């Protein structure tokens, strides 16, 4: 049985967003996957970018805003290579749910 996520966003919309921003893998993690997800919770999103994706800080802000609009709630967008704390990295990678893979 496929687990239903508490987000209303189509696979086509996710794929279009990922192609536009050169995202090779997009995954959810955190409370969105647990029972403590609430109406006021943000959505934690993990992105792995293509090697040729060279985005500025402003691009990341636009990306986060666009993603927040698409999912209908605040998104916290984290880049996989930015996960430097080994304990946090291990936990996120072990519990994430991939929603797009190129």
Regions found by a protein language model. Give the residues of each.
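Catalytic core of pol beta-like nucleotidyltransferases
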Residues: 1-25, 33-35, 39, 50-102
